[in-house]
UniProtKB/Swiss-Prot annotation:
InterPro entries: Scorpion_toxin-like, Scorpion_toxin-like_sf, Scorpion_toxinL/defensin. Residues 1-27 form the signal peptide. One of its GO terms (cellular component) is secretory vesicle. Keywords: Antimicrobial, Disulfide bond, Fungicide, Plant defense, Secreted, Signal. It is found in: Secreted. One of its GO terms (molecular function) is serine-type endopeptidase inhibitor activity. This is Defensin-like protein 195. One of its GO terms (biological process) is defense response to fungus. It comes from the Eukaryota. Its main location: secreted. It holds the Pfam family Toxin_3. The record marks 48-49 as: Reactive bond. The lineage of its organism: Eukaryota, Viridiplantae, Streptophyta, Embryophyta, Tracheophyta.
Amino acid sequence: MAKAIVSIFVVFFIFFLVISDVPEIEAQGNECLKEYGGDVGFGFCAPRIFPTICYTRCRENKGAKGGRCRWGQGSNVKCLCDFCDDTPQ
């Protein structure tokens, strides 16, 4: 009986260690993306420039891994600095 209780305790203890050591899933959404700031306009995200000025400026000025453009209604465009992914888009 005592061996069974000790065994169960050991199993739970190992399970706890494994769960606490598992790395967290990389941040997504708002934790990764921060707006560059200001009205950057179309020039920051012009589709024919690769990588975009948004990508380059986020890396140089904000210390981010990259930058992404989000297009809204009409000419509304936002530059979001990406602190998790360095893939140019």
